[in-house]
């Protein structure tokens, strides 16, 4: 009689960043739900167990659902550098689950956070969970969400920091060109975009530097 192998003693993921509480949401194309226990690799760290992980999913034009974002170690670790180094007026391209905007607003060097989101249903999902209402008043007052196009948006006052995450895949070979366009529109002096380490490595390989 065979017996299942015991599960390895895996660490449970604990992020040093703020993790909002999410409420279930079901819209025409977007939904928010939770996974009870998931084994997830990190962006910088080995696999860890995550309990009650929130996921934002989107149904594509063929009717197939895709996980667009989640509170997984991969997602958090791949964006936390941008949040930790944000300053001044921060423009966040892509609301997602509101995580990056919330953590940027908590940074003492940040004075204002403007979030640009194209899809009103994503805005509704984050609003239903009251993500920014979970922040201290001083941080909550810094956040403003506007519906707009990340490639076209020009802020009323120039940005100091640009945080961009509007893509489904982690890597895009031409993503830096898209981000340069956003920088030109916003006037941002510093930028962090999702997957930028992979783009840097890709450019280095193209030039024979790696």
Residue spans for each PLM region:
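N-terminal auxiliary segments of SAM/dcSAM-dependent transferases
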Residues: 1-50
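The AdoMet/dcAdoMet-binding core of the Class I SAM-like
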Residues: 1-19, 74-210
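Conserved SAM-binding loop and adjacent beta-strand
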Residues: 46, 66-79
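Surface-exposed loop/turn and secondary-structure junction residues enriched for glycine/proline
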Residues: 33-35, 59, 98, 113
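Short polybasic amphipathic segments
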Residues: 52-62
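Long, low-complexity, intrinsically disordered polar/charged segments
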Residues: 1, 50, 63-69
């Amino acid at each position: 009689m065979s017996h299942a192998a015991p599960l390895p003693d895996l660490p449970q993921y604990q992020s040093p960043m703020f993790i909002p509480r999410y409420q279930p949401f079901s819209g025409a194309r977007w939904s928010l739900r939770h996974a009870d226990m998931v084994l997830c690799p990190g962006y910088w760290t080995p696999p860890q167990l995550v309990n009650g992980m929130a996921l934002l999913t989107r149904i594509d034009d063929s009717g197939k659902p895709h996980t667009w974002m989640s509170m997984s170690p991969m997602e958090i670790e791949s964006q936390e550098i941008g949040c930790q180094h944000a300053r001044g007026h921060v423009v966040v391209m892509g609301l997602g689950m509101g995580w990056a905007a919330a953590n940027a607003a908590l940074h003492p060097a940040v004075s204002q956070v403007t979030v640009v989101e194209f899809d009103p249903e994503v805005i509704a999902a984050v609003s239903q969970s009251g993500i920014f209402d979970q922040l201290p008043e001083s941080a909550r007052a810094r956040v403003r969400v506007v519906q707009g196009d990340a490639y076209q948006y020009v802020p009323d006052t120039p940005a100091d920091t640009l945080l961009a995450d509007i893509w489904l895949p982690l890597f895009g070979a031409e993503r830096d060109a898209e981000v340069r366009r956003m920088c030109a529109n916003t006037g941002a002096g510093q930028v962090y975009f999702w997957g930028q380490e992979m783009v840097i490595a890709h450019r280095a390989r193209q030039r024979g530097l790696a």
